[in-house]
């Protein structure tokens, strides 16, 4: 099953076989020498060109390839290691460990292209996924097996939220996480690894990186590498897994780069004509089955802040919840800097989460919205010109804003204050009390960077005594 290279077009390689035609998605191997150094390269068949010729996408740099070099067909797809052994390790797109530790000897390998769960296998229950982060659980709750878009610019705390979620899943739900860095900056991937090591969550997460400097094939397929590892924990171990993709925009972008080289005519804004289908292929595999679930959190970069751009627009159709991070909130020193009015969730309805939760959440949003509307008046005339009713709303809104902040476990190293996991019950109890005016007598500083309402009362007491 040997062939030879007949053409190299950047990351796309055409190969001719004599009597064998490899299937679409089959892996091909090339071993070659560059300046006296032995190199191996994996290709993946993307198109049949007629005759016994195929067009394949390279999973690494193609420097040093020449025509007539020997190519071996594997007879199977790219396969990656799965199982407990992948935890705490970093992998590239073809499942090789790249963390300079001992090479992994996997007991199990799975192909990266797999069918999405069928209708019969999918779970139809909608269950809330408790994160222990007050602002998310109250105002934009995640659902088990749901998909969440994490929107935010640089430096507002996307990575910290991702790490806290990994921590809480590991320690409260006893679950595992998989992180796929799709078109990541190498520096960010490196930082994440060491921050997780310091935060003590590394042994509960598998990391897969296809960095920004790699060819589009590697950046595109790395999402499937990570997803395959997550599917093993869901299907074979019956676990609820958390899957992080950073950044889903770059998955679409790498697809566009490959599409042009494969000779497809581009569609709107230069994207691949198959954009919606490719996005669906990835997203449909992220689902809850009767065994377990994969809940995914996907960072979404929005090019030029244009939400109608085809790439982010193709993601929106699949999302169940959005968590929007706001720089203005971060500047106030409120972390996590989640925007309570911009973040949304499909399950925020009385049928899904119950009347009580729904009433408290909408009550909180109304108070915050009213405060936002009053800010212009406050800026021009000052607080004293407001009616007594409005003054009360402003006071409560400021307490709510402060109470939406929370110390994180993974930030303990930097802040010195111990992290807090707040159950949904405690969250609802605290915010209901603020809405009902139970805590109108407590100074707003007592609400800042604490967990449950119990801690607010203790903090207020110690502030009074001191």
From Swiss-Prot:
GO terms for cellular component: plasma membrane; proton-transporting ATP synthase complex. InterPro entries: AAA+_ATPase, ATP-synt_VA_C, ATP_synth_F1_bsu, ATPase_a/bsu_AS, ATPase_alpha/beta_chains, ATPase_F1/V1/A1_a/bsu_N, ATPase_F1/V1/A1_a/bsu_N_sf, ATPase_F1/V1/A1_a/bsu_nucl-bd. PROSITE patterns: ATPASE_ALPHA_BETA (PS00152). The lineage of its organism: Bacteria, Pseudomonadati, Campylobacterota, Epsilonproteobacteria, Campylobacterales. Disulfide bonds: none annotated. GO terms for molecular function: ATP binding; ATP hydrolysis activity; proton-transporting ATP synthase activity, rotational mechanism. This is ATP synthase subunit beta. The keyword Ion transport applies. HAMAP family: ATP_synth_beta_bact. It catalyses: ATP + H2O + 4 H(+)(in) = ADP + phosphate + 5 H(+)(out). ATP binds at residues 152-159.
């Amino acid at each position: 099953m040997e062939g030879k290279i007949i053409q190299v077009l950047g990351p796309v390689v055409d190969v001719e076989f004599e009597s064998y035609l490899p299937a679409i998605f089959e892996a091909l191997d090339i071993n070659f020498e560059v300046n006296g150094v032995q190199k191996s390269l994996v290709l993946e068949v993307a198109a049949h060109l007629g005759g016994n010729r195929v067009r394949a996408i390279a999973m690494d740099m193609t420097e040093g390839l020449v025509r007539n070099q020997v190519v071996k067909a594997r007879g199977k797809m790219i396969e990656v290691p799965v199982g407990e052994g992948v935890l705490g390790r970093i992998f590239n797109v073809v499942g090789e460990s790249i963390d300079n530790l001992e090479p992994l000897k996997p007991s199990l390998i799975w192909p990266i292209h797999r069918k999405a769960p069928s209708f019969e296998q999918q779970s139809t229950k909608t269950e809330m996924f408790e994160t222990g982060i007050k602002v998310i659980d109250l105002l934009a709750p995640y659902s088990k097996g749901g998909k969440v878009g994490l929107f935010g610019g640089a430096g507002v705390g996307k990575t910290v939220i991702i790490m806290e979620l990994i921590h809480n899943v590991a320690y409260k739900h006893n679950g595992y996480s998989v992180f796929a860095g799709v078109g990541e900056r190498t520096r960010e991937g490196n930082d994440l690894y060491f921050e997780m090591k310091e935060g003590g969550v590394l042994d509960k997460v598998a990391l897969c990186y296809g960095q920004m400097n790699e060819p589009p094939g590697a950046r595109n397929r790395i999402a499937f590498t990570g997803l395959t590892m997550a599917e093993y924990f869901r299907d074979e171990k019956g676990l609820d897994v958390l899957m992080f993709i950073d950044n889903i925009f770059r998955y679409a972008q790498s697809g566009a780069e490959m599409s042009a080289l494969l000779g497809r005519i581009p569609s709107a804004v230069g994207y691949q004509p198959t954009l919606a289908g490719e996005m669906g292929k990835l997203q449909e595999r992220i689902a809850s089955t009767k065994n377990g679930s994969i809940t995914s959190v996907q960072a979404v970069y929005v090019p030029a802040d244009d939400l109608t751009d085809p790439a982010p627009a193709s993601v929106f159709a699949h999302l169940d919840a959005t968590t929007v991070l706001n720089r203005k909130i971060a500047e106030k020193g409120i972390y996590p800097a989640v925007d309570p009015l911009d973040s949304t969730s499909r399950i925020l309805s009385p049928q899904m989460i119950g009347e009580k939760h729904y009433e408290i959440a909408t009550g909180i949003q109304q108070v915050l919205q009213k405060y936002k509307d009053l800010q212009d008046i406050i800026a021009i005339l000052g607080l004293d010109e407001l009616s007594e009713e409005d003054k009360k709303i402003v006071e409560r809104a400021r307490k709510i804003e402060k109470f939406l902040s929370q110390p994180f476990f993974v930030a303990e190293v930097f802040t010195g204050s111990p992290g807090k996991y707040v159950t949904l019950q405690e969250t609802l109890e605290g915010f209901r009390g603020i809405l009902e005016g139970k805590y109108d007598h407590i100074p707003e500083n007592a609400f800042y960077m604490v967990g449950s309402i119990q801690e607010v009362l203790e903090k207020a007491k110690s502030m009074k005594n001191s």
